[in-house]
Structures are given as C-alpha cells and as structure tokens.
From Swiss-Prot:
<dbReference type="GO" id="GO:0050729">
    <property type="term" value="P:positive regulation of inflammatory response"/>
</dbReference>
<keyword id="KW-0202">Cytokine</keyword>
<dbReference type="GO" id="GO:0045515">
    <property type="term" value="F:interleukin-18 receptor binding"/>
</dbReference>
<dbReference type="GO" id="GO:0035655">
    <property type="term" value="P:interleukin-18-mediated signaling pathway"/>
</dbReference>
<dbReference type="GO" id="GO:0005615">
    <property type="term" value="C:extracellular space"/>
</dbReference>
<dbReference type="Pfam" id="PF00340">
    <property type="entry name" value="IL1"/>
</dbReference>
<protein>
    <recommendedName>
        <fullName>Interleukin-18</fullName>
    </recommendedName>
</protein>
<keyword id="KW-0964">Secreted</keyword>
<dbReference type="GO" id="GO:0005125">
    <property type="term" value="F:cytokine activity"/>
</dbReference>
<keyword id="KW-0963">Cytoplasm</keyword>
<dbReference type="GO" id="GO:0019221">
    <property type="term" value="P:cytokine-mediated signaling pathway"/>
</dbReference>
<dbReference type="GO" id="GO:0051092">
    <property type="term" value="P:positive regulation of NF-kappaB transcription factor activity"/>
</dbReference>
<feature type="site" description="Cleavage; by CASP3">
    <location>
        <begin position="71"/>
        <end position="72"/>
    </location>
</feature>
<comment type="similarity">
    <text>Belongs to the IL-1 family.</text>
</comment>
<dbReference type="GO" id="GO:2000556">
    <property type="term" value="P:positive regulation of T-helper 1 cell cytokine production"/>
</dbReference>
<comment type="subunit">
    <text>Forms a ternary complex with ligand-binding receptor subunit IL18R1 and signaling receptor subunit IL18RAP at the plasma membrane. Mature IL18 first binds to IL18R1 forming a low affinity binary complex, which then interacts with IL18RAP to form a high affinity ternary complex that signals inside the cell. Interacts with cargo receptor TMED10; the interaction mediates the translocation from the cytoplasm into the ERGIC (endoplasmic reticulum-Golgi intermediate compartment) and thereby secretion.</text>
</comment>
<dbReference type="GO" id="GO:0006954">
    <property type="term" value="P:inflammatory response"/>
</dbReference>
Amino acid sequence: MAAGPVEDNCISLVEMKFIDNTLYFVAENDENLESDYFGRLEPKLSIIRNLNDQVLFINQGNQPVFEDMPDSDCTDNAPQTVFIIYMYKDSLTRGLAVTISVKCEKTSTLSCKNKIISFKEMSPPENINDEGNDIIFFQRSVPGHDDKIQFESSLYKGYFLACEKENDLFKLILKEKDENGDKSVMFTVQNQN
C-alpha cells in the first residue's frame, strides 16, 4: 500500500513584502496562527539542590538561599523547600518554559527583574503574552550530565540561575554563564509528585 500526500499540512502563502529590509509573509487565512505567548500547564512539586547537594529554600526574609539539609528537614520545612514548578506551553521552541513558585503563607514567584533574583508575591498567571518575561525561565538538561538541569532567563538571554557564596550564605543569583564548564548554574530537581 503506497502512502499518499497529507492534505492541509501547510500554510498557503499568497503574498510576500519587504518592509525595512525584512521579508514578511502574509498568510491567506491566519485564524489558526498563534501569537508568541506562554500558556500555563500543570505544576510539579520539586526540591531543587545545587551541586553541593544543598537544598534551595526561602528564608525568613523571603530570599532564596541554599543550605545543608537532610531529607527529613526538607519534609518538615516543606512550605519553604518544596517549589511549585509550572510548565508553560511556549509558541517558540527554546526549552521547557517554567516559573518557580513557593507557597508559604502566600504564593510567591521567582523573578529576575533587573537581573536581581527575588520572590514576587503573586501566583503565576495562566498566560503570559511576552516573548521574554522576568518570571519565565527555560529549564534545560545539561549536556553530558543526565540528572543536571539549568534555568536560563527568558528575559536575559545567556543569563542563568546560579548558586553563589556570599559571606556565609549560598544564594540564588542570576549570572551570565561562563562557557568554561560553569557548574554554579547546574542543579538537580527532585520531583515530589
């Protein structure tokens, strides 16, 4: 039995035009086209650790820090150690788009506004109509490391969540990735559900 061509598997282009040295294609019928946006999917509850096996948690000042913590303490302190990672459908292919939230008394969502990491008191929205946003990160696996993950900012290309020692604290920061095997941008994500 021979395979036949699949019908209606393309967009008919009826017109092309140059505007300011950019070629634009005009679709005959654009009712099925989507604009660039992120659409929220189901969440995962996760514990995030740095490469020193320290657990990410929210301290009393609502700041994300890493600390040595046995699994039993993670369970006892679940509101501060279990993060809600919402996955988003992305209209572009750039990695798994996610937000990272925590629910202590209220829901707070991780933001990298002005390249500063903080938690905003807000629930992640259902849809985000931007191509880049301060609360969206691209979760990707690290080549050569089966169980390691990195999170790139959708707003600041080339900037990643990282662990950095500051005084006696290990803090979560946003930094430009060093191409020489920077391990500070690698994490393990242990799903709880």
